[in-house]
Amino acid sequence: MFTINAEVRKEQGKGASRRLRAANKFPAIIYGGKEAPLAIELDHDKVMNMQAKAEFYSEVLAIVVDGKEIKVKAQDVQRHPYKPKLQHIDFVRA
């Protein structure tokens, strides 16, 4: 099982997302279940290495946010059109 450390996003929007990407991070969201959607930020290089394996897309992942572990599955991955970079990931609670 993959474990990903994340932080809750403090600001949202296009400018905030661009600042995250410039800092080698990228935005993501966790939704589903009975809880409210949670906007998070992830470290780009760590997740890029994880998503290179097929198991990233088929297995349940653990995301640790503020010391709390959330079980999720990758629902949608948005990539940069020509650079080997991730733009955004949607996770659904498992």
From Swiss-Prot:
One of its GO terms (cellular component) is cytosolic large ribosomal subunit. It comes from the Bacteria. Pfam families: Ribosomal_L25p. SUPFAM superfamilies: Ribosomal protein L25-like (SSF50715). Keywords: Ribonucleoprotein, Ribosomal protein, RNA-binding, rRNA-binding. Part of the 50S ribosomal subunit; part of the 5S rRNA/L5/L18/L25 subcomplex. Contacts the 5S rRNA. Binds to the 5S rRNA independently of L5 and L18. This is one of the proteins that binds to the 5S RNA in the ribosome where it forms part of the central protuberance. This is Large ribosomal subunit protein bL25. It comes from Shigella boydii serotype 4 (strain Sb227). The gene is rplY.
